Amino acid sequence: MSLIKDIKARQVIDSRGNPTVEADVILDDGSKGRGISPSGASTGSREAIELRDGDKSKFGGKGVLKAVNNINTEIRDLLIGKEATDQAAIDNAMIALDGTDNKARLGANAILAVSIAVAQAAAQSKGLPLYAYLKTDDYKMPVPMMNIINGGEHADNSVDFQEFMIMPVGAPSMSEAIRYGAEIFHALKKVLHDKGYNTAVGDEGGFAPDLKSNEEAITVILEAIEAAGYKAGEDIMIAMDAASSELYKDGKYFLGSENKTLTSKEMVDLLSDWVTKYPIISIEDGLDESDWDGFKYQTEKDGKRLQIVGDDLFVTNPKILKEGIEKGIANSILIKINQIGTLTETFEAIQMAKDAGYTAVVSHRSGETEDTVIADIAVATGAGQIKTGSLSRTDRIAKYNQLIRIEEELGSKAVYPGKDAFYNLK
């Protein structure tokens, strides 16, 4: 038995300088776990609700003392004496206590911090690393999506699309994939500098230059890949997050940097042309979260050659994902633990995706912390892909360093899938 003895929460700070929730769970055998909730900038309308205080005199209204208090009172009272190793029972008890569909009463940020902390404490009690404790499938090291050019909501620049990423599919291991990424990141800094562009970084550690067009983001990355000594299309593939819900207004997509307005079909066709022209293997949220007809068209047109990832579309919600699978919408889901708010529901979404032949990409948020739980989740579930930012900023690097450690611990069991991570593409 590993019974919960005490729970304590506090307000801490995320990578954007905004408050977030941290929870500690202590078990009767002295084991202790800690969890911190991340926070997003571009959010899907159907995400679980972060509880914020709304007191404009403190942190601009973004304080989380109400959520902290909910942990220190109601959630603590509920969970004291409960068995920590029964994660599903713990998570379901918190969901029932909250009583809303979207965790709005207690706050998904409160529930998630406790969910993570319970798992960490239980793993420590059993003497296991977190990934081993959480294991639901064969271990797989995740191929990283490394966000090296930031735009959209993640940067104050002229680039409309939110993320341009590299994926080291040709690397033989996790640690080598990280080396490939770091070398390209440094090469890109030089490419941008030589062209007279700013080399300041955005929320996720990627560069945020004022480029002449959205397409130039791809061409400068291709230059950097070559300058670093790698081959685009073989060693490295490109991935994008268009975050198109941020560009959608009155049924059209507005690309401000190019002063263009596109219909849903035109948006799909634009992205499709890029997939033909460049080594792009994955596009996330190419359309607005409500534009299911557009996603259907994109899936029918490009779903056999392109990973079409639903983020705002599915918000890590098994119910919404199930509907998408039934309608043939997209072929991949982005997994953000705070979109749904418990580890149990996160694992359910990953398993549902796999069972349907969809891929799952475990992801950070733009407001991150030193918490590395998503690295362990990616390995434990065999998801095969992770999106955790660029090769700068400690809030991003913490996850890469954890993956290096896990790979070392696993030894010969550490399989790095490379292009096999895209098991549903032809």
UniProtKB/Swiss-Prot annotation:
The active site is at E204, K336. Disulfide bonds: none annotated. Pathway: Carbohydrate degradation; glycolysis; pyruvate from D-glyceraldehyde 3-phosphate: step 4/5. Gene3D superfamilies: Enolase-like C-terminal domain, Enolase-like, N-terminal domain. It catalyses: (2R)-2-phosphoglycerate = phosphoenolpyruvate + H2O. Keywords: Cytoplasm, Glycolysis, Lyase, Magnesium, Metal-binding, Secreted. GO terms for molecular function: magnesium ion binding; phosphopyruvate hydratase activity. Its cofactor is Mg(2+). Mg(2+) binds at D241, E284, D311. It holds the Pfam family Enolase_N. (2R)-2-phosphoglycerate binds at Q162, K336, R365, S366, K387. The keyword Cell membrane does not apply. It is found in: Cytoplasm; Secreted; Cell surface. One of its GO terms (biological process) is glycolytic process. Catalyzes the reversible conversion of 2-phosphoglycerate (2-PG) into phosphoenolpyruvate (PEP). It is essential for the degradation of carbohydrates via glycolysis. Belongs to the enolase family. This is Enolase. It comes from Hydrogenovibrio crunogenus (strain DSM 25203 / XCL-2) (Thiomicrospira crunogena). The lineage of its organism: Bacteria, Pseudomonadati, Pseudomonadota, Gammaproteobacteria, Thiotrichales. The gene is eno.
